[in-house]
Amino acid sequence: MDAFENMSVSNHPGGNARRNSQSANEMLASQIQDFQNIPRSFNDSNANVNLSKNCTVGNQLPFSSRQQKIIMEHLLITKNNSQQQKDYSHVPCKFFKMGNCQAGSSCPFSHSPDIISSANNLPCKYFAKGNCKFGNKCVNAHVLPNGFKMNSKEPIDITPPSQNNYLSHARSASFSTYTSPPLSAQTEFSHSASNANYFSSQYLMYSPQKSPEALYTEFFSPPSSSSSYINYSYNNSNINAYSPVSSSSSNIWQEQGQTTLSNPSVNQNLRYRTGPAIQEESDNEIEDLLIHNFNSRYCHE
């Protein structure tokens, strides 16, 4: 401390610059010499200083104040480092896992196969956050969403069995959806044909067993009031004079301009269709209308 004070005094304003530089070099050389003169027998672990035999407690230590300061700082640094050391015996050694640990038995990390194998199956929490600095050399498992590990070729199962079954079922369902062939034209045509014969098949299914002639006559005869077609009015001279009228309960065929239902609530649901409106109807209704017209005109003759 005296040397630093002398240097600060010699550097007062107005002093000689050459004299100041020479004195600074001399003091720096003396400090280096004093540091080299520290006894080799000094041990930092137990902080014991070998004193001379004729040195009593009241006498001064064989070190200057500057040397004592350096020694105390060194002791404090080593003491803090010893207190900050942790027990890493439960942490697997990543270098031993890779086969290049040079520490051997003095390695602070564990070389136990059980600890290393358990660490391999433990998912890395830093990889889940996206900031694992070890990469493929990490001791823990870098698990992908599909269940495989990036740093190993063996799969790891981290999901419950029920979830695995659900995922496998979802994958198989999606695979079958994408790999199923599209409907062919023949299939679509047969589907439309089945829709066209829907009412006739339902009628034949739930009707009692009758002869083909009776079924033909009953099917193509004008509907009665008890059937789904009510208030039927027919004119053989003109087919375009009739149009289908749909209601909430049944399909009604009636002549244009003629109101056949007396119930006001039913009349609100009636919708009159003219000749162009018939073209907008489905092919099934037009086909039924033409067949009914043909049979009623020629079969009874």
From Swiss-Prot:
Zn finger limits (C3H1-type): 87-114, 123-145
Polar residues bias (residue ranges): 7-25
Location of region: Disordered: 1-25
Modified residues (Phosphoserine): S21, S30, S282
Keyword annotations: Metal-binding, Phosphoprotein, Repeat, Zinc, Zinc-finger
Lineage: superkingdom: Eukaryota
One GO biological process term: protein polyubiquitination
Transmembrane segments: none
InterPro entries: MKRN-like, Znf-CCCH_4, Znf_CCCH, Znf_CCCH_sf
Presence of the UniProt keyword Zinc in the record: yes
Name the record gives this protein: Zinc finger protein LEE1
Species the sequence originates in: Saccharomyces cerevisiae (strain ATCC 204508 / S288c) (Baker's yeast)
Record lineage: Eukaryota, Fungi, Dikarya, Ascomycota, Saccharomycotina
